Amino acid sequence: MDPLGAPSQFVDVDTLLSWGDSYEDEVDCADSTAEAFQEDASRSPFVYSRDVNGKVVLWKGDVALLNCTAIVNTSNESLTDKNPVSESIFMLAGPDLKEDLQKLKGCRTGEAKLTKGFNLAARFIIHTVGPKYKSRYRTAAESSLYSCYRNVLQLAKEQSMSSVGFCVINSAKRGYPLEDATHIALRTVRRFLEIHGENIEKVVFAVSELEEATYQKLLPLYFPRSLKEEIRSLPYLPADIGNAEGEPVVPERQIRISEKPGASEDNEEEDEDEGLGVDLSFIGSHAFARMEGDIDKQRKLILQGQLSEAALQKQHQRNYNRWLCQARSEDLSDIASLKALYQTGVDNCGRTVMVVVGRNIPVTLIDMDKALLYFIHVMDHIAVKEYVLVYFHTLTSDYNHLDSDFLKKLYDVVDIKYKRNLKAVYFVHPTFRSKVSTWFFTTFSVSGLKDKIHHVDSLQQLFSAISPEQIDFPPFVLEYDARENGPYFASYPPSPDL
């Protein structure tokens, strides 16, 4: 606490000049306004908005000094990173912050977690973990960084926060190019304020002297302060400006779905792209599965010459598109909170690693329809490239087990791309019962999977295919493996800093 009568070291965000008020180039822009409106075709996807600009602040200073509802701390997955932002926050917040962080048990890349602000002027601290950057895996890094900003803002919205102070989430030691990262930061915040920002009054970008120039350069692209600045900035926008939420988009991953489900099938077929799909690695029995009809009957029709293979593929494709459309519109936050399915690093061949935690799937307690939709929502953009699945069967019980009838139905529903690009399934800590069940399932139901299943009795075996630094292990998996196979893994952290 400051001595009585001494000036406070903290800065109230309401005293800071907004981005919109900082514009001095054109005091009277009536002529340019008229001119810009005449050139409708030249409008930017990030149009001039006085309201949005009034909510944004660029401030050179320490984010820990901001007096706002919440500030953002960038850290590593164990929330113990030593960087200037974190060290300042910890110093000013006091020792209670470290105790509170221990209860969180880490934070995965792209996630956001909340603690109190303690001795800070800010009521809360939102902790997030930015990605490490490697040009080879640029798309994954972009998606993770987007998730950082998006999840911070989503948390602020859910907690009814009126003001948020952002540090620069990408840290220099993680190698993310500042300008590339700033594009993602600005467009994500812009899109969120447009769509969900009705209750957010201030978003402050707290930057260092080195970072300020980049933000000054790029802010006009996403937050133009006049119509003239909007038009002037348009040629400098990058080709990839993300989707409607600002999320990075890879062109070959985009699909077109009819906005009118009742439209004729001819029109629907014209609107669909090839190569959408899902794999069998998750859960749920859904009424949508019946949209496709009886698959065995369809196969009989094929044999009888009554239904061509091409016609069946089109019908199958339409069915998956309905699943995907529903997955994108449904609120799946309750399923996401289970942390049963998530993306981690890459295997030794550079393929994306997806993790399924069997113990986190309470089959008898959750809405299996929504679980399947969540699987599609997560996997749709993953399965366009080669990937592997790591399934932790560790310490599962009967109510975590999926029956073979459902898995067979799910396998029949998914698209060929998901099956083709799935290169391996690592079944970690199997039991005798699970090995027998898997053998029967892959022998008599889905023979195409049989050669891809690898039973892994210890984590040491898994490391021959995937480096331990590339997997985010649930703590109970590490504890079980150390108990059953020896404590050789003790040198690896439970939440590797990917």
Curated annotation (Swiss-Prot):
Modification Phosphoserine, positions: S281
SUPFAM superfamilies xref list: CRAL/TRIO domain (SSF52087), Macro domain-like (SSF52949)
UniProt feature, compositional bias: Acidic residues: 265-275
Domain Macro: 43-223
Keyword Lipid metabolism (UniProt): no
InterPro entries: CRAL-TRIO_dom (IPR001251), CRAL-TRIO_dom_sf (IPR036865), Macro_dom (IPR002589), Macro_dom-like (IPR043472), Macro_GDAP2 (IPR035793)
Pfam families linked: CRAL_TRIO_2 (PF13716), Macro (PF01661)
GO terms classed as biological process: response to retinoic acid
Tissue: Expressed at high levels in brain and testis, and at low levels in liver and kidney.
Superkingdom of the source species: Eukaryota
Induction: By differentiation in neurons.
Keywords: Phosphoprotein
Region of interest (Disordered), ranges: 248-275
Family: Belongs to the GDAP2 family.
Protein name (record): Ganglioside-induced differentiation-associated protein 2
Annotated organism of origin: Mus musculus (Mouse)
Designated gene of the protein: Gdap2
